[in-house]
Amino acid sequence: MEKQRLKAQLSSLRVPLFSVPWPEQCSNKAEVVEARMMKWADEHNLLVTDEYRNRVIRTRYGLLAARCYPNAGDELLQVIADYLVWFFLIDDLFVDCVEVATDETIRNLTAMVDVLDLNVSGSPPVFGELAWLDVCQRLRRLLQVEAFERFAQGMRLWATTAALQILNHLRPTSVSIREYQTIRRHTSGMNPCTSLADAANKGSVQACEFYNADVQTLVRQTNNIVCWANDIQSLRIEIHQPGQFRNMVTIYAQQGQSLQDAVETAATRVNKEIASFCELANAFTARDISHELHGFIDGLKYWIRGYLDWVVHDTLRYADQFIESDADDRRFSAPDLSLLNNSCSSVTESTRSLV
């Protein structure tokens, strides 16, 4: 009933554009990174059918990496692109585009946490686990220990707050905006992404800099801007998902607003958050701060602008013409693990060479 009421308002929906006062950036390695990312996804059996492969091709995750990390070294940029294609596919297949909860949900998510905690895969591995181990081992080699742990903690919170998101969708009505924002802040996967912003620019910041209160406010604002804008931009496809479909816009609609008014309310919040980010970033960078911290704050800006440009110029992830085919992944939700097992030994050998 809730979904049907929302779907009835989609045909006339107007989605706003967002802008920020700093220029577009993109690595000149974007196309190479995209091609290598597709090859890597193939080698790790992430592209479960030709239909799914075509979806990934038109989504352009390598371009997202190139826009959000324009100054990253070649090796780091590639592992980030590989991480992004892995994350979007796993998030869709484990959480968003399948039933709210399945028999495999707990096993799948705990396997991802175990890779972070134990630095090994299970036997047998779940879908995507060997690819995830490969990403983590490459990042461990490229990042300082504490910097990797920031990334890892963000991913642990993604896996664990997914359970809160599932609980919210098992309720007859959604939790409030405040509770939703807490869940969204971590299920988005933005914290692992922003944790790489320093290494991808001018080098790792010290822990005392990263955890500075103003810096953490900038990180949260970056997270909010991307997540809340995405709640608007992905609204049409998310409403058609069989499992997770509630977001900031639908919660405002649940409170009595029309869907268009709910979009405008969310958009106003995005624009206010952009203004607050700009004010704090300008004030903070006017201080005597380290070269690396300047690079980190630049990296947050790259993520905001890079994501917004990716949605407008590159990706078809949220395109209307693919809603019917892309919103429901239940037919892909239990990929044949024999695909993984057939290549398990070769992938494991290539992974070991990275340690």
UniProtKB/Swiss-Prot annotation:
Specify which residues bind Mg(2+) 1 according to the UniProt entry for this protein: D91, D96
Which biological processes are named by the entry's GO terms?
isoprenoid biosynthetic process
For whether the record's keyword set contains tRNA processing, the answer is no
Q: Name one GO molecular function term.
A: terpene synthase activity
Please list the residues that bind Mg(2+) 3: N230, S234, E238
Share the domain note from the entry. The Asp-Asp-Xaa-Xaa-Xaa-Asp (DDXXXD) motif is important for the catalytic activity, presumably through binding to Mg(2+).
UniProt lists the family membership as follows: Belongs to the terpene synthase family.
Query: By what name is this protein known?
Result: Sesquiterpene synthase MAN_10655
Q: Which organism is it from?
A: Metarhizium anisopliae (strain ARSEF 549)
